[in-house]
C-alpha cells in the first residue's frame, strides 16, 4: 500500500485544494493530510486562518480523497509526523508538496529517503483569489 502525506492550513477550502487532493490520491492508496493550526506562527508572511481549526478539520474529513488527518502546530511537528510515517511505511511513503516548493533546500523531506511528488497548479484557484472575489461581491 502506498501512503501519501500532504500538509497545509487549508483555510477556506476551495476547488484548488480539491484538485490537489485528487491529484495526490492518483499516486497513493491512502492519503494523510497534515492540518496546520496557524501557518502565521511558522511563516509570518502567511495569513492567519479565517476559519477555526474545527471548521477546517470538519470540512476536510468529509472529502472523499482524504483518509486521515493529523493536526500540527509547527515545523517540529511536521518533522515528527514525517519521522513517524517513514518509520511505519518506509519507501511506500510519498510526500506531496506544491510545485512552488521545488528548488528549496531546507525541507525536512530531503533528509529522508522518500519520494517527493510536486503537485501541479494548472489553475487560478487560491485562497487569495477567493478572498478578493468575496470582498468585491460584498
Residue ranges and their predicted role:
Residues 1-138:
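Nucleotidyltransferase catalytic core that binds NTPs
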Amino acid at each position: 500500500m502506498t501512503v501519501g502525506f500532504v500538509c497545509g492550513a487549508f483555510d477556506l477550502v476551495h476547488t484548488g485544494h480539491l484538485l490537489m487532493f485528487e491529484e495526490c490520491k492518483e499516486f497513493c492508496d491512502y492519503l494523510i493530510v497534515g492540518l496546520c493550526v496557524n501557518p502565521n506562527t511558522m511563516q509570518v508572511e502567511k495569513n492567519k486562518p479565517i476559519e477555526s481549526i474545527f471548521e477546517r478539520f470538519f470540512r476536510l474529513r468529509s472529502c472523499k480523497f482524504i483518509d486521515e488527518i493529523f493536526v500540527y502546530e509547527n515545523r517540529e511537528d511536521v518533522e515528527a509526523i514525517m519521522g513517524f510515517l517513514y518509520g511505519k511505511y518506509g519507501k511506500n511513503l510519498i510526500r506531496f508538496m506544491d510545485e512552488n516548493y521545488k528548488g528549496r533546500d531546507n525541507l525536512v523531506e530531503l533528509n529522508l529517503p522518500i519520494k517527493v511528488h510536486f503537485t501541479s497548479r494548472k489553475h487560478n484557484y487560491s485562497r487569495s483569489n477567493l478572498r478578493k472575489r468575496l470582498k468585491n461581491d460584498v
